[in-house]
């Protein structure tokens, strides 16, 4: 008997507006991804991360999908990723989205069942992130940008997408310091102090000024979380269109056209850590044929 597998690729995302201060946020898909491969096994749930990451979120997602379809099935999910964990690049949202879609596609095909709608898969992935304690707000902004690709602007409390559109194709440069930052361990009361100013950044993105929104948000959260805003300013000085902290850090993201790419890398190369170069992802989470 042929073993049926379903493989799904899901992009990470970078922050335009961090939703923790106000409950409203914005993010866009990036070209670093999680890939999840799902297949049926005799019984139980097996989850394996090729990078050795914690699999509890994957296991929760898998069990939630099995429960949704009401089938007696064993499922194995194996993930691989070039998306760093605990870095502010939505690794948890991408892993949730990839796992939910892979297992859903597998079970609906194998058992001849009605596939889940996109919004159902997205909501299930967000529920799993909240239940697993890897997110403060459920990260609906990050999760929706990862799921649909492009730019999303969201009300995380209401789980509502206010705006969704393709993102202009730009280079995305990411500075990753030699430290991790788990969102659920962040100082939430301190971030909520920023609400009036984060609201100003939020209005910028609604008015189409994504670059200024990203930069303002990124510098505000640097102040709240104790990161050095000079890292973003160095990128801006080198020609970046926008630069700021992504998520709750520790990664910084800069958007640029190709002509400034080398200058920004030069500006960051003396910092401890790595600089990654990728691009905007407008495809989102999808089953690979």
Swiss-Prot record:
Enzyme Commission number, as recorded: 2.7.1.71
Location(s), subcellular: Cytoplasm
UniProt xrefs under Pfam families: GHMP_kinases_C (PF08544), GHMP_kinases_N (PF00288)
GO molecular function (one): ATP binding
A GO cellular component entry from the record: cytoplasm
Keyword Calcium assigned: no
Reaction it catalyzes: shikimate + ATP = 3-phosphoshikimate + ADP + H(+)
One GO term of the biological process aspect: chorismate biosynthetic process
Keyword Kinase annotated: yes
UniProt-listed Gene3D superfamilies: 3.30.230.10, GHMP kinase, C-terminal domain
UniProt pathway: Metabolic intermediate biosynthesis; chorismate biosynthesis; chorismate from D-erythrose 4-phosphate and phosphoenolpyruvate: step 5/7
Main EC class the enzyme belongs to: transferase
Binding site for ATP: 84-94
Keywords from the named record: Amino-acid biosynthesis, Aromatic amino acid biosynthesis, ATP-binding, Cytoplasm, Kinase, Nucleotide-binding, Transferase
Source taxon at top rank: Archaea
NCBIfam families listed in its UniProt record: Shik_kin_archae
Family per record: Belongs to the GHMP kinase family. Archaeal shikimate kinase subfamily.
Name by which UniProt lists this protein: Shikimate kinase
